[in-house]
Amino acid sequence: MNEAFDCVVIGAGPGGYVAAITAAQAGLKTALIEKREAGGTCLNRGCIPSKALLAGAEVVTQIRHADQFGIHVEGFSINYPAMVQRKDSVVRSIRDGLNGLIRSNKITVFSGRGSLISSTEVKILGENPSVIKAHSIILATGSEPRAFPGIPFSAESPRILCSTGVLNLKEIPQKMAIIGGGVIGCEFASLFHTLGSEVSVIEASSQILALNNPDISKTMFDKFTRQGLRFVLEASVSNIEDIGDRVRLTINGNVEEYDYVLVSIGRRLNTENIGLDKAGVICDERGVIPTDATMRTNVPNIYAIGDITGKWQLAHVASHQGIIAARNIAGHKEEIDYSAVPSVIFTFPEVASVGLSPTAAQQQKIPVKVTKFPFRAIGKAVAMGEADGFAAIISHETTQQILGAYVIGPHASSLISEITLAVRNELTLPCIYETIHAHPTLAEVWAESALLAVDTPLHMPPAKK
């Protein structure tokens, strides 16, 4: 007789494992199915390993600028294989901790590929094939890097890389091309440029980071260009050829050669061959599974979370969706709220944003005021030697409600949390500038930006009248 569970989760990425833990904590008998390692793309092939390498690149930057602090460093070198070894160690350590969490929550783990055979049964394909029954099912199958048309990622073309393969390089490329100027492309461009690579970013549109607001796109393009990154915009790549020790690219009819090429042109959803048709779950031509605000699909006992929902392709969104889905399965009535989703670009400098952008506000005909306060007027940033950049608040012109924000500069990834809380709770400008911010800290930039919105900044000359 097939074992039965209250909740079966297919996929143990940042959405799936969080959903499974939440379900188990609610007292549900829970199973988690994963064909690879717990943690999914984020932990094993994405967020965490890339940030481990970026941490090393940040140390390189600090050494290069050490003279500014009265510290002279002679003859340092980069041992890239050791950086990769550290990256792998970081991933292993976190994964071991995650596996311990899963065990401690008494979640039954099945190793293999999960596929629906009905709305209440899941087949597990692997070394020990089996079928389990489920009262409720959460689909959390994620996505994979999209290949360049006609050029699949394979061992036969080791110099043509996806975001997974580039993390396993054993050397720093002398000359590298990155096809795609989105978030992932720009993060790797920033990483390898900092480590000494000559990097060219090839982008089909007229701007990089095109899904963000134009101010971010232009500011980061200018910063990257000053740093020495090369961009080819409005570019058409008609051919990629691995010629052994090099890769040959044809860009706008011109032939260029590189040591490695990273293809970063988006991700494809893992909704094929998971039995959606057998369970009656609807998906569109892109593979997106529509859900309601409780993460329920068109089949009442089947939920979907993460990339396959077609919302934000962000680990923290998948995790929150997983919590919402599991709590609804456990009998709570909760709905997802996408009004305050923080987004971070881990480049040098960092970029973060949340809520409405000025462009979105204009499109929705919402009257807003955008105030940008520079880090050069923040004492802590100057003391750190990282005074480049700014923090901007988007507030309603009449009500002073904080509708969004974006920040380019030191520790932007951490700074955005304060304004995420403000947007989520519909706070107003006084809630920020009337709150005492510790001094000297980078977070003071938000108080100053909020004061600037009411024309009373403390550390900026008054506007000329």
UniProtKB/Swiss-Prot annotation:
One of its GO terms (molecular function) is dihydrolipoyl dehydrogenase (NADH) activity. Binds 1 FAD per subunit. Keywords: Cytoplasm, Disulfide bond, FAD, Flavoprotein, NAD, Oxidoreductase, Redox-active center. NAD(+) binds at residues 180-184, 203, 237, 264-267. It comes from the Bacteria. It catalyses: N(6)-[(R)-dihydrolipoyl]-L-lysyl-[protein] + NAD(+) = N(6)-[(R)-lipoyl]-L-lysyl-[protein] + NADH + H(+). The keyword Transit peptide does not apply. Belongs to the class-I pyridine nucleotide-disulfide oxidoreductase family. This is Dihydrolipoyl dehydrogenase. It comes from Chlamydia trachomatis serovar D (strain ATCC VR-885 / DSM 19411 / UW-3/Cx).
